[in-house]
Every structure is written in structure tokens, then in C-alpha cells.
Curated annotation (Swiss-Prot):
It comes from Pseudomonas paraeruginosa (strain DSM 24068 / PA7) (Pseudomonas aeruginosa (strain PA7)). It comes from the Bacteria. One of its GO terms (molecular function) is hydro-lyase activity. Keywords: Lyase, Pyridoxal phosphate. This is Probable D-serine dehydratase. It catalyses: D-serine = pyruvate + NH4(+).
Length: 448
């Protein structure tokens, strides 16, 4: 029984569950998608909130440049490159034996400074927002001051009386632990069994307390939440429900618009933009997709990609039960090499907020992630961690889908030929050489 209903009844009502339970790569194109002008109201946040977050990051830029010299060239703004990957596109055409019209680009959040993943957006933003609240309330800075003063010993001593806590499969903990420690906070990261050892080691090297669990992500989050509950000096970063995290990710969209403009890429109804976002609990891709819908409206089509063993958002939105169901309820084990996506229960906040804004969801098996990892390195010389490749099959899934999605959305052959597909590469820039070598060897063996 699942939520009081026999499994057979679930399968009768939701036939796509059969593929999810069998761990078969599958896709579902959302029939409930609505015009963005209407569906954006579901989120409970708006353009003014994203602009406020962007302004906050601007205020902190002098401090970031001071604490992290690698950001000095961008003036303390944490941003990633946008690159066309035409050779990888050609390799995918061969790999999938399909034409795959349009152009293919890669958003390299894998190489964001400070923590080398998309979590350098939301995670760092939430810690900065919390630090700003404390600093303003306690007279450490004023809104118009130079925030680099927060690196001074008296400010660090003040922050040392406060703790930041988070539950993570790895990358979120890495970003929050590093920025928290850099500001002077005590930081504790509750890490699930999936977390890579090198990420734990890196955090400890920064003076962060790492608490390890034999269980999965949801348990780590719950323990982190419990630690913070009774302590007014502890701020818990709630990856399942945080609006600050969500807004930190959403800021990416306006910056991407500038990068697309600079590259001469049009985005409108005749030149659609498809953005393929790896999804774990949902905060990162949800926030980015929200920002994209604000920036491009119905001209952008956002799709979430998940491992076959951890399809939590697909499951939650498809059944309409969101965080009430986990993949484990259906006998799916939530064990995947895509450690950043190893989440069994989705964010109910993101699922409900975004369910009418997302075009679809698809799953990818681990072997395919490794093949694509090796294929990208072979064709473009770009190295990513497995979870960052989840969006790479998206161009083929959209082109070949049999569910009437393209017709429903008015995606004619001419529009698909004019399309830009953007794979959001979420992590991998800080993977140790030996570990990356093992990833590549596994991928090459599967390809050859």
C-alpha cells in the first residue's frame, strides 16, 4: 500500500509508473503546462524578488572578490561561461542515430568559482542573505556601505557566534560550508551516504563540521533541520523549502539573457530555447527555470532530467502527490552514480510552484551518463561529473518524442531547426584527477 492505495491501483491510474519502477529511461511531457503569464502566479514570487536578489549579490561582490581572489576578474560576481558544443552535437547525432536539429550549447556551472557547481548560486546566495540580515540588524554595515568590511576581524568574530547547518548529497554542502567558513560562521554539513569522500575532505579542510549518515538525502536534511530547530543562533538552509535558495538560482536567467544576446542568439516563438536541467530535490533547476520563464516567457521550454534510480520530481509531479511520495515507496532504490541527483523525495514547494511551467521530465540511466561524460570529453575536451550530463540526452528526447508534445506546443520543423538547446552542466569542475580518470575510463569502456 502507498498512501493507503494498492500499488496496482497506482499503476492503473498512472501508467508511466511502470517504466519508472522498471528503471527504464523514460519521459513525460506535461499536458498541464500553461502560458507563463498565467502560471508564474503559482510561484508566489516575482520579478521584483529576483531583482532584489540580484542587487544583494551586487552589494556583496566587493566582499566576494576580497575573500575569493579567483573572482576578482569578474568583480566578485559568481558566473559561468556559455559555450557552443558543436562537436559534441555531432557526436550525439551519431550516438543517437538521429538528426537532432538546432544548435547545442553548454552552460558551464560545473566551473563556477568557489565550489565548482550550480550550488555556488543558491547556496552562497542564501548564506549571504542571512549574513546581511544579521549584519544590518547588528549595525555591522549599512545598505550603502562597502560590504568588504565584513571580512574584518570584528565582523568575523560576530559571525563566529552563529552557525549555518545544511543537509546535502555533496555540492550544496560544499558551497554553503565554504562560504560559511570564509565569513567566519561555524558550519555543519549533514551528508547522506551518496556524498563523495573528496567533498567531505574538502569541507573538513575548510574547518567545516561534516556529519555523515548511512541513510539517504532526506534523512540528512531532517537531521540538519532538527539540529537547528532549538537554537536561535543556527540558520538551517532548507533545500526542500527555501525561497532564498530558489531566488539565488533564479538570478542566473537575466545573466544568461545577456550571454545569449552577446552570442547573437535570438529567443522568441520562432527561435525557441530548450533548457535541460539536471534535477535532484528541485531547488536549483526550479529556481533557474523560474528565472528563465520570467526572462523569456513562453519562448523558453524547461525540462528536468533525473537518474532512473532517483526520479523523485518526475514521480511527484506526474502523480500530483509531490513530497507525499518517495521513489522508495515504489521500490526504486535511489542509488545512482549521479550523487548530486540522488534524492528520493522531491521539494513540494518547487513541484507545486513549477508544475504548470515545466514542459517535461525525463530519466537517464547511469551507464548513459558515463557514455555521455566520455563523449563530451572526447569531442570537446570538457570534463564533468556524471550528474552534470543528465541534460545531454534532452535534445534527442525532444526531437523523437511520440506523445504529441511538439504538435501541442506548436514546435514545427522550422522552429526546431531554429532552436537553441542548452545543457545546464551542474558540476564537476573540482573533481579530483584520479576520480575523473575513473569516470572517463568507465565511460570509454561503455562507448567502445
Amino acid at each position: 500500500m502507498i498512501l493507503g492505495t494498492p500499488k496496482a491501483d497506482w499503476l492503473a491510474e498512472f501508467p508511466r509508473l511502470a517504466d519508472l519502477i522498471a528503471l527504464r529511461p523514460s519521459e513525460w511531457f506535461n499536458p498541464a503546462i500553461a502560458p507563463s503569464a498565467e502560471a508564474l502566479a503559482d510561484v508566489g514570487l516575482g520579478a521584483a524578488d529576483v531583482a532584489d536578489a540580484s542587487a544583494r549579490l551586487q552589494r556583496f561582490a566587493p566582499l566576494i572578490a576580497r575573500l575569493f581572489p579567483e573572482t576578482a576578474g569578474s568583480g566578485g560576481i559568481i558566473e559561468s561561461d556559455l559555450v557552443e558544443v558543436a562537436d559534441f552535437h555531432d557526436a550525439l547525432r551519431q550516438h543517437y542515430a538521429a538528426e537532432l536539429p538546432g544548435r547545442l550549447w553548454l552552460k558551464r556551472d560545473s566551473h563556477l568559482p568557489i565550489s565548482g557547481s550550480i550550488k555556488a548560486r543558491g547556496g552562497i546566495y542564501e548564506v549571504l542573505a542571512h549574513a546581511e540580515r544579521l549584519a544590518l540588524e547588528n549595525g555591522l554595515v549599512g545598505l550603502d556601505d562597502d560590504y568588504s568590511r565584513l571580512a574584518e576581524p570584528d565582523c568575523r568574530a560576530f559571525f563566529a557566534g552563529h552557525r549555518i547547518a545544511v543537509g546535502s548529497t555533496g555540492n550544496l554542502g560544499l558551497s554553503i560550508g565554504i562560504i560559511g567558513a570564509a565569513l567566519g560562521f561555524q558550519a555543519s554539513v549533514h551528508m547522506s551516504a551518496d556524498a563523495r569522500q573528496w567533498k567531505k575532505d574538502k569541507l573538513r579542510a575548510h574547518g567545516v563540521t561534516v556529519v555523515e549518515y548511512a541513510s539517504d538525502y532526506s534523512v540528512a536534511v531532517e537531521q540538519g533541520r532538527r539540529e537547528a530547530a532549538g537554537d536561535p543562533y543556527t540558520h538551517f538552509v532548507d533545500d526542500e523549502n527555501s525561497r532564498d535558495l530558489f531566488l539565488g538560482y533564479a538570478v542566473a536567467a537575466e545573466r544568461l539573457r545577456g550571454q545569449l544576446d552577446a552570442a547573437g542568439i535570438r529567443v522568441d516563438s520562432e527561435h525557441p530555447l530548450f533548457v535541460h536541467l539536471p534535477c535532484g530535490v528541485g531547488g536549483g533547476p526550479g529556481g533557474v527555470a523560474f528565472g528563465l520563464k520570467l526572462a523569456f516567457g513562453d519562448a523558453v521550454h524547461c525540462l528536468f532530467a533525473e537518474p532512473t534510480h532517483s526520479p523523485c520530481m518526475f514521480l511527484g509531479v506526474y502523480t500530483g502527490r509531490h513530497e507525499q511520495v518517495s521513489v522508495q515507496d515504489f521500490g526504486i532504490d535511489n542509488r545512482t552514480a549521479a550523487d548530486g541527483l540522488a534524492v528520493g523525495r522531491p521539494s513540494g514547494f518547487v513541484g507545486r510552484a513549477m508544475q504548470r511551467l515545466l514542459d517535461g521530465y525525463y530519466t537517464v540511466d547511469d551507464d548513459e551518463l558515463f557514455r555521455l561524460l566520455a563523449l563530451l570529453e572526447r569531442s570537446q575536451g570538457i570534463r564533468l561529473e556524471p550528474s552534470a550530463l543528465a541534460g545531454a540526452p534532452g535534445i534527442a528526447r525532444v526531437t523523437r518524442e511520440p506523445q504529441g508534445y511538439r504538435e501541442r506546443m506548436g514546435l514545427t520543423s522550422a522552429r526546431l531547426a531554429n532552436a537553441t538547446h542548452l545543457v545546464w552542466a551542474t558540476g564537476g569542475g573540482m573533481v579530483p584527477e584520479a576520480e575523473m580518470h575513473a569516470y572517463l575510463e568507465r565511460g570509454r569502456a561503455l562507448l567502445d
